[in-house]
């Protein structure tokens, strides 16, 4: 394999932005045979590499996987925790999981002598970090060619975004996160970083630290900023239609929202939780 040393060691690479917290690499004594892949992002790359984990996290509805992946045993992993005893029962020799679980479960994995490769995921990760993570995973578990292939796929997306931006007029935009008036997202959030590649000026960047990501907001600020278009996302709404029902009920109950051009003109884009 591309990431394997002559001694039989297996070298897993971290993306640059995680080097400070995790180091540049995770070195295993040998190629792992029983991987518990508790990250959908990592699972997409492992599936492309033809690697079959012994257990996986619940599959994201928005991600596409080969048929065989849907036959694998699953364990629920999320912000509320995970069933670590069930994971131990599969006797993994490597666990891949989001770094947000490290504080709670890292020591238990260490005590059990199970190496852990942490991935970065959630609303605070940017497009660029997502790209770096995918390439690092491909370097670690695939081949140099596969890493180059994935890098080229991201480059193609960026080229399409640049062409779209060059041919469309810019619009004043806000991202409403969770529910109307609860949170806003700057250009450093996951969705915000992708929309920053398109012809949108994120008004939240002008009233809060752009590096803040997803931060609290109030209705008065949104009304004052008066975006031409609003992108709505929520971790609790599986589909855009679910989210539309929540938002439109709130918009109808609070006439003040009609002062915003985007609301008044029906220019609100409701996205599924895959964009969170």
Label every model-predicted segment.
Residues 21-22, 75-85, 209-219:
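Short helix-initiation/N-cap motifs at beta->coil->alpha
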Residues 194, 212-239:
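Ligand-binding pocket segment of bilobal, Venus flytrap-like solute-binding proteins
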Residues 60-65, 184-213:
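Alpha-helical, coiled-coil/dimerization segments enriched in small aliphatic residues
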Residues 74, 84-97, 114, 219-232:
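Proline-aspartate-enriched helix->loop->beta-strand connector
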């Amino acid at each position: 394999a591309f990431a394997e040393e002559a001694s039989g060691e297996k070298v897993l690479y971290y993306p640059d932005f995680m080097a400070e917290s995790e180091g540049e690499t995770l070195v295993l004594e040998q190629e792992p045979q029983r991987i518990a892949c508790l990250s959908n992002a990592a699972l997409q790359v492992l599936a492309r590499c033809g690697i079959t984990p012994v257990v996986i996290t619940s599959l994201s509805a928005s991600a596409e996987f080969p048929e065989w992946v849907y036959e694998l045993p699953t364990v629920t992993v999320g912000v509320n925790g995970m069933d670590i005893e069930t994971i131990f029962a599969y006797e993994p020799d490597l666990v891949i999981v989001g770094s947000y679980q490290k504080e709670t479960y890292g020591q238990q994995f260490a005590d059990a002598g199970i190496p852990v490769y942490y991935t970065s995921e959630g609303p605070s990760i940017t497009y660029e970090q997502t790209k770096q993570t995918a390439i690092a995973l491909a370097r670690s578990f695939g081949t140099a060619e596969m890493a180059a292939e994935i890098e080229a796929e991201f480059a193609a997306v960026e080229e399409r975004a640049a062409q779209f931006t060059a041919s469309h007029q810019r619009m004043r935009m806000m991202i409403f996160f969770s529910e109307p008036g609860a949170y806003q997202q700057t250009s450093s959030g996951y969705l915000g970083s992708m929309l920053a590649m398109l012809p949108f000026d994120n008004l939240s960047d002008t009233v809060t630290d752009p590096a803040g990501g997803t931060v609290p907001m109030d209705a008065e600020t949104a009304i004052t900023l008066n975006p031409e278009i609003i992108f709505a996302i929520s971790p609790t709404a599986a589909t855009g239609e679910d989210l539309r029902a929540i938002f439109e009920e709130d918009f109808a109950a609070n006439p003040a929202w009609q002062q915003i051009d985007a609301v008044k003109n029906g220019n609100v884009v409701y996205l599924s939780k895959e964009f969170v």
